[in-house]
Amino acid sequence: MVLALPSALYSYGQKKGNASLAFDEMLTAENLPRPPYKDYHEWYAAQDTAHLIRKTQDAENIFRKTGITFAVYGHADSSEKLIPFDIIPRIISAREWRKLAQGIEQRVLALNAFLDDIYHKQEIIKAGRIPRELIEKNVAFLPEMIGFKPPGGVYTHIVGTDIVRTGEDQFYVLEDNARTPSGVSYMLENRETMMQMFPELFTLNKVQRVEDYPRLLRQSLAAVAPPGCKGKPRVAVLTPGIYNSAYYEHSFLADQMGVELVEGSDLRVLDGKVQMRTTRGYEAIDVLYRRVDDDFLDPLTFRPDSALGIPGIMDVYRAGNVTIANAPGTGICDDKAIYSYMPEIVEFYTGRKALLENVPTWRCSEPASLKYVLENIADLVIKEVHGSGGYGMLVGPTATKKERSDFAEKLSARPSNYIAQPTLALSTVPIFVNKGIAPRHVDLRPYVLVSDKVKIIPGGLTRVAIKQGSLVVNSSQGGGTKDTWVLED
């Protein structure tokens, strides 16, 4: 039996703004549940709104007690904040997930091949598929990595691929996060919280597991230990320290993997190895999962004023005596100008068309593109090529006339610093509000582990624009998160 949700509980009928044009992942145009949501839809229809309000409050209390917070630097109030968590899951069918997983694996393998190529033979440049200056003048390109192959030949050990949806079978990659992708702790805590609060839902719905991620991460890191490693590889997580906005995640992952959480001051280079200070003296580290940016990794190689890294670690790395995950120099794959070439990159290294499409992108460094973007700035989303976290971007349709004018000046002054994309009607998923549920735009960050094999965690982190009409899902801009369910066949 298919139930339509009571109108008092379901506010989709009053869609406004961008949401009215978007593909809704839960309901059809006839207000009927799509297949992945059928069982959840029936369960929700029988729930009491007051009960769900209490559950939302319970979830907030769980997150607060657990200490799952983040800080937004540069704001007047940079205190630790909770990321809003929504109790309504995002549900993806097994068929939909298979399609996504195939495209993600193809893309991640292409990224790794691209990194190996640009730091060695540079065949893609010689073939004229990507401009030389885009690589060699890129601030994220590290000459120190030229000619060096990391242990196992893996550059991108952990990847977060941001995906958006615009229709039934229309998925796009929004960006690649190949340097230090974050957010996986929220994926894990979201699932644990949902299982604690709604155990009956996991009996009703056969949901694929994400809880194995810490174990799989440790296995994946151990698999790329240096060739000279004897016995069980020693893994550690390198954090910038307690004042970093993602420190909770660093601590959480180290604890869940059962490995040491270290800062640069805990490590030193001795006898050609990276050694960790312990109560028994110094002991060698084989694999370092670093959450410290390239610039701060080694003050002898990069920024001499860095107190976060380990002096001499790059010499140990290049000698093949430690694995750094992700490899230094992978940040070039996060560059949004490089992103615009991903269809060519995927085809060049895999011999096949990309299974997952890019969002159409104008490179503002090109005069014709710049002219188009300036003339159509009110309709476009404009981003800094090295930007992240929703900073430094303009969403034309929601910006004021003055904001667009000011941004056009910045764009004209440094066109190579920007790309532009159409304003997509991102798919919507319901969030719980005091009057029932309402549609909000979402994206998805699946997490990929790469060693001698590729492992994609089923689901990932769904980020949701909590504010009505907003397309910005970043937590630094007020976005929230959801548990993401991938159903079994």
Predicted stretch roles:
Residues 3-489:
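Preference for protein termini
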